[in-house]
């Protein structure tokens, strides 16, 4: 067998794409514009994302506890029902080879595979595949049928299992029903009830690729090569059938989902061990996607006018590929066939580029999905050949030819990671099949020591305030530790005290030199307390407690007596428990709460403030009170005076709002400092304050100004302190899944 490159580089492709999507026209946005405030004033911060997933859209009620309901679930019975579904073929969408396994593997993969590591968005953790745009992406064609097949199971178990869990559990069950041993599974995903507003790219047509610049540089944080795809175009970049060029796209997009080369190769080879793609006829005979389909189709899309439209006549992608002779069984035949032939280009019945063995080799060795008397020729996608023709992937996959047990192990681990990457630490996982924590789950030690009680907390607060650290230092350090959290994939946060480890201790926003000195003092307090015997305090708890004590002291300085809630139980992670590369993506490009903006950032700071607030699960009132309070506490990056509109810093006052709304101050862009504004006395012109756009937006944006007016009022001093304390505690506890 020759290893020469079998690629034709001069072909043109039809407008088909990913392994399961039809080449149908994109939906055209219509409407009478301008029709919203955003249309009139597109540069205003969009605060609507901070109102998303309101309880008003959730039918389950405020008291619904998914974990409690799940505890009532017979998971073994659920598993039996899902596995039974695999071979219960339905006439309205017949199962290929009498088994829906390949379809459900694809459904689960595409539910989880939208995850992107750059901002943690996407993934299967909320059941978003049920809603637009994901339910109508060309890459998700025919997955509406998979979800409808699952409906009787969901209907039977009701609120005891979420759609989010079921959509990914089905793929796990599919693998096991086809003889594969999975690595494990964790439930615990809670459903959303409205679409997620996520930036999926700049294009306004399906399969557009305006996201590239220069030498095929993919814009961040996007994780797919074209609009409406999960990863890559299986025909090759922009439909050009070049496996080597496709490998570059594969490597980039899978890396943006936190997968390395071994994991990537395992997922592609493992996933394509099962099932088939569908391109029995011309793609222009396929109707509109679910969101564009007529009401009588009841949310089902892509209705085909080719033959019966289903079974042997099904069109989903325009590609007609069956990879192995055993498409409902786990084995090593995908790799055996990939390396067993030399390959040449051909086209599917729909006109899509795909590959067959040269010189008619292998003809009749692949079974037909609906006619047991017929045989087919082996077929591959351009992106399958990438696993052989890319030198790195070739080294990995060729070894698996002789070591199938290694392939199975790597696929099991990669599949588990794919399904769970956006779920956060294992403390969020439910069910009996959760394996030991993996490094990518950011593990922390269990809390085995006796926890500090109220008396210990009082002693530690006193020692922290007497340690020589200022209110500002204690607040800033606690905020830096906790505010690394992002709600999109439940990573970061104060638990683990990773602020003292690589890479966080060297992030610019954390002011490494100052941070190091503060941590040394906190470690001294910790050591002195722990050496006394009895309860032990972790550095993670002490960092948060320092901020808590400082907030209480600052409120006292303002004449307000408040108690800031504190719950011990955090533990300290080690450097060995911390994947440095994985944590690098958590470094903030901006943190408006600390008035930090990374050099060279092009997106306005006030827009990035909203994104940071979204990551911290904050509402507009919480954002407002936190910014105002942190300015009063002098918690700015670099201790700049921007936005510190007070002559009594480190005192928890509402001075930020009072002075921001004072019409005696006139604001002008600074002539000496970028992204800074000078506030001068309107009557005399004397300088009064400096500010950033993050500060001034609380006076310029009408919604934020309305909130600022509440806190600037004469009767708001106590409310301001109490609201700040509540919002502060919320941020400190965002990653306390053990108690929340």
Curated annotation (Swiss-Prot):
Textual note on the cofactor: Binds 1 heme b (iron(II)-protoporphyrin IX) group per dimer.
Any Pfam family: peroxidase
Cross-link (Tryptophyl-tyrosyl-methioninium (Tyr-Met) (with W-109)): 231-257
Site (Transition state stabilizer): 106
UniProt keyword list: Heme, Hydrogen peroxide, Iron, Metal-binding, Oxidoreductase, Peroxidase
Taxonomic superkingdom: Bacteria
UniProt-listed GO biological process terms: cellular response to hydrogen peroxide; hydrogen peroxide catabolic process
Swiss-Prot/TrEMBL cofactor(s): heme b
One Gene Ontology molecular-function label: heme binding
Presence of keyword S-adenosyl-L-methionine: no
Keyword Heme: yes
Post-translational modifications reported in the UniProt record: Formation of the three residue Trp-Tyr-Met cross-link is important for the catalase, but not the peroxidase activity of the enzyme.
Crosslinked positions (Tryptophyl-tyrosyl-methioninium (Trp-Tyr) (with M-257)): 109-231
Annotated catalysed reactions: H2O2 + AH2 = A + 2 H2O; 2 H2O2 = O2 + 2 H2O
UniProt: heme b binding residues: 272
Region of interest called Disordered, as start-end residue ranges on this chain: 1-44
E.C. number(s) listed in UniProt: 1.11.1.21
Family: Belongs to the peroxidase family. Peroxidase/catalase subfamily.
Function summary: Bifunctional enzyme with both catalase and broad-spectrum peroxidase activity.
Protein name: Catalase-peroxidase
Highest classification ranks of the organism: Bacteria, Bacillati, Actinomycetota, Actinomycetes, Mycobacteriales
Gene name of this polypeptide: katG
